[in-house]
Amino acid sequence: VLEWIFCSKIIRLNIPRLDAAKVDPVRQLVFAISEPEPLPTVLKIFNVEGQELLLSAPPENAYFYYLTFNLSKEVIVVCSFAIHQNGWYDWFYTYDMKLNTLSRSGPAC
């Protein structure tokens, strides 16, 4: 269960096999990765009211590894690939709110 408070209202979401979650204070979003097999295979992004904005599988041949922040204090997703991608296993992915998609932003080194 993932839970937070927004405008004095408790938002409670059932996310099976939740691995990690982070709040993006800049864009007022909640990111959650779940279903570890062995690493997470599902990413969900919600607005602060609990509405699901994105449900995503990881890129092909990758897993969601962890959630962190970029220099702008926005949540970014690290994806880990089984095979090198341009010399790296781990890559940062950002959420594009306008296109409602993830895009690779650079190596996670």
Show the residue positions of the predicted features.
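Surface-exposed loop/turn elements that mediate protein-protein interactions on large endomembrane-trafficking
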Residues: 2-15, 41-59, 86-107
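A mid-sequence interfacial segment
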Residues: 59-94
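Repeated scaffold domains used in trafficking and secretory/extracellular systems
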Residues: 13-27, 58-72, 106-109
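Short beta-strand elements that form the blades of beta-propeller/WD-repeat-like
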Residues: 1-3, 24-37, 73-86
